[in-house]
C-alpha cells in the first residue's frame, strides 16, 4: 500500500515536469521558426 501511495504522489509530478518541458520546447521551436510548415534543416 505504501508503494501505491508513493507511485500516486510521484506520477503527477513527473507528468507535470514532462508537459512543462514539452510546452517550453514547442514554444522555443515556434519562436525560432515562426509559422514553419516545413523545417529548413531537413
UniProtKB/Swiss-Prot annotation:
Any matching Pfam family: PSI_PsaJ
An individual GO BP term: photosynthesis
Major location (coarse): plastid
The organism's place on the tree of life at top rank: Eukaryota
InterPro entries in the cross-refs: PSI_PsaJ, PSI_PsaJ_sf
Keyword Chloroplast: yes
Keywords attached to this entry: Chloroplast, Membrane, Photosynthesis, Photosystem I, Plastid, Thylakoid, Transmembrane, Transmembrane helix
Function: May help in the organization of the PsaE and PsaF subunits.
HAMAP family: PSI_PsaJ (MF_00522)
Protein's UniProt name: Photosystem I reaction center subunit IX
Organism, scientific name: Capsella bursa-pastoris
Upper lineage: Eukaryota, Viridiplantae, Streptophyta, Embryophyta, Tracheophyta
Chain's gene name: psaJ
